[in-house]
Amino acid sequence: MASRKDTLVRRASRVRRQIKAVANGRPRLSVHRSSKNIYAQIIDDVAGKTIASASTLDTDLRSSLKTGADTEAATAVGKLLAERASKAGIKDVVFDRGAFIYHGRIKALAEAAREGGLNF
């Protein structure tokens, strides 16, 4: 029987494999969530560089948020990331949710990024 960690690793590798198949040179929007915060960054895998990033630990957001672990915080991170991506000239990305299920905070961040102008 596979452990919980094995299942997460297998799911993450499956998602990354699918992303590589459809990326076509587009940067990826990678999302990570912990129990207290949420982090997102846009990564150019060809160059191996981070183009834009945002998290609930940013000084721009930290003072305005009650906590970094709710959907309101994820929405704020998504909007901030979309704003920073547009300044960097990025419109189209591939969404990399990793091993996280597309629900709750991950979904809130993705929808806010779409509203902010990112296409995925």
Swiss-Prot record:
Highest taxon listed in the record's lineage: Bacteria
Record-linked Gene3D superfamilies: 3.30.420.100
GO process annotations (BP): translation
Pfam families given in the database record: Ribosomal_L18p
GO terms for MF: 5S rRNA binding; structural constituent of ribosome
CDD domains recorded: Ribosomal_L18_L5e
A GO term from the CC aspect: cytosolic large ribosomal subunit
Signal peptide (from-to): none
Task of the protein: This is one of the proteins that bind and probably mediate the attachment of the 5S RNA into the large ribosomal subunit, where it forms part of the central protuberance.
Quaternary assembly: Part of the 50S ribosomal subunit; part of the 5S rRNA/L5/L18/L25 subcomplex. Contacts the 5S and 23S rRNAs.
Name of this protein: Large ribosomal subunit protein uL18
Species name: Rhizobium meliloti (strain 1021)
